């Protein structure tokens, strides 16, 4: 490789077209470069360039310590401290105005004698952008929140009915704060996976994060293997203080990405368990709600859920979180009541439908999105309202079965809505 190629910066790579990037990738011997998206290809080139000079290329999520230095935590290690962490010096943090949660990529060196960690010697990119972009960022708390105005299209395979139903009855916009109200065994995890894959297929530039709190380890493996998303997990066998750390660093990472104008989606399973974990970790305030919930423990989960917003200045943070109901636990009931009404979209799952093995077990009448008129065009909106009026005259089971039968006869929601025109006269 020529000396000139060794010094290509991320800014220069971003300004190149895909054909030029392919030529560089070919000369560097990068495998399967034609199947990569542009951003992934740029980072593969940076990595290959760095390694050809005898150094390493490293990346991680920055956690700054009170003493002023920081470490890059690996997503593969669920953002927890490990021996593979990369040291960032206080001077680098000050020079580039870095914050906890920034994703840092750059040239790293091996630990010297007496050192324990790899160290960053040159920062190449901050949040997948050239380092100069840090000067244009607006702090997350100073961004103006707005209603979601641009819809995520989730519909993919005609046979995946859950995403088709969500698109019609509870559309998700960029910046939505959504809650999936789920009794046990109603299929919430399957719906989360289908939402993640729907966004991945139709909106590939969106950064998708699935955050699993207090879940079973085998479920974590299943979600990792079946979704196209970043999966960060704090399973039930992890100490509560570490689970809290994972959740907080994940939120900081998402906020930093929004500051850089990315559309970020966090799928949280589950908000109830996150609140339970905080209830263990937070120092007692001396007051107790029914079920043993400390009111002080609910502040941080509310802060997490409340971070979801569309912003007028650019990026958006969408959070779709599951809330557990009908578990037999008074604590879960209190947590759900505290969060009820804080979201602007609700998807309600039904235990009765799930018991009869009618999936997706969605209660269509109780599910919906606030200000859906900002997300759906007028024609679609009228037809969805007509469907709701039809469903109100039927039982929960009859309504869902009718809609699922009609969806199975059509290959897309567009075709399904045209079918309504033909049958309108009958109702």
Curated annotation (Swiss-Prot):
- Please name the Pfam families in this protein's record: ATP-synt_ab, Rho_N, Rho_RNA_bind
For binding ATP, which residues are annotated in this chain's numbering? 173-178, 185-190, 216
Please give the superkingdom of this protein's source.
Bacteria
Kindly indicate whether the keyword RNA-binding belongs to this entry: yes
Q: Which GO terms describe its molecular function?
A: ATP binding; ATP hydrolysis activity; ATP-dependent activity, acting on RNA; helicase activity; RNA binding
Tell me the Gene3D superfamilies matching this sequence. 1.10.720.10, Nucleic acid-binding proteins (2.40.50.140), P-loop containing nucleotide triphosphate hydrolases (3.40.50.300)
Q: Which InterPro entries match?
A: AAA+_ATPase, ATPase_F1/V1/A1_a/bsu_nucl-bd, CSD, NA-bd_OB-fold, P-loop_NTPase, Rho-like_N, Rho_factor_ATP-bd, Rho_N_sf
Q: How does it assemble?
A: Homohexamer. The homohexamer assembles into an open ring structure.
Name the UniProt record assigns to this protein: Transcription termination factor Rho
Q: Which organism is it from?
A: Thermotoga maritima (strain ATCC 43589 / DSM 3109 / JCM 10099 / NBRC 100826 / MSB8)
**Organism ancestry:** Bacteria, Thermotogati, Thermotogota, Thermotogae, Thermotogales
Q: What is this protein's gene name?
A: rho
């Amino acid at each position: 490789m020529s000396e000139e190629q060794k010094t290509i910066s991320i800014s220069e790579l971003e300004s190149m077209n895909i054909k030029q990037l392919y030529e560089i990738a070919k000369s560097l011997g990068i495998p399967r470069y034609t199947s990569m998206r542009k951003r992934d290809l740029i980072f593969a080139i940076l990595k290959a360039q760095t390694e050809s000079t005898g150094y390493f290329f490293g990346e991680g999520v920055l956690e700054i310590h009170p003493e002023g230095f920081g470490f890059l935590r690996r997503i593969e290690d669920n953002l927890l401290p490990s021996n593979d962490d990369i040291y960032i010096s206080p001077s680098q943090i000050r020079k580039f105005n870095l914050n906890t949660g920034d994703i840092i990529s750059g040239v790293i060196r091996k630990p010297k004698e007496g050192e324990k960690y790899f160290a960053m010697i040159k920062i190449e990119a901050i949040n997948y952008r050239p380092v100069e972009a840090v000067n244009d960022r607006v702090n997350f708390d100073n961004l103006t929140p707005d209603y979601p105005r641009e819809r995520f299209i989730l519909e993919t395979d005609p046979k995946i009915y859950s995403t088709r139903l969500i698109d019609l009855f509870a559309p998700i916009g960029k910046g939505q704060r959504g809650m999936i109200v789920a009794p046990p065994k109603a299929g919430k995890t399957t719906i989360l996976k289908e939402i993640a894959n729907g966004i991945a297929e139709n909106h590939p530039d969106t950064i998708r994060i699935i955050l699993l709190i207090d879940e079973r380890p085998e479920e974590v493996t299943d979600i990792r293997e079946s979704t196209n998303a970043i999966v960060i997990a704090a399973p039930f066998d992890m100490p509560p203080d570490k689970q809290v750390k994972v959740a907080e660093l994940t939120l900081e990472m998402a906020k930093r990405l929004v500051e850089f104008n990315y559309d970020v989606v966090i799928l949280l399973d589950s908000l109830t368990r996150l609140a339970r974990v905080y209830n263990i970790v937070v120092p007692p305030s001396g007051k107790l709600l029914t079920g043993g919930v400390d009111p002080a423990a609910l502040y941080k989960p509310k802060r997490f859920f409340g971070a979801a917003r569309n912003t007028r200045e650019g990026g958006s943070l969408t959070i779709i979180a599951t809330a557990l109901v009908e578990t037999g636990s008074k604590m879960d009931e209190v947590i759900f009541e505290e969060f009820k009404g804080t979201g602007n979209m609700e998807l309600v799952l039904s235990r009765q439908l799930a018991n009869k093995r009618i999936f997706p077990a969605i209660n269509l009448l109780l599910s919906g999105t606030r200000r859906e008129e900002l997300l759906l065009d007028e024609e679609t909106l009228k037809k969805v309202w007509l469907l709701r009026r039809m469903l109100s005259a039927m039982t929960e089971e009859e309504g869902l079965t009718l809609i699922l039968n009609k969806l199975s006869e059509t290959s897309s929601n567009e075709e399904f809505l045209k079918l309504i025109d033909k049958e309108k006269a009958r109702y």
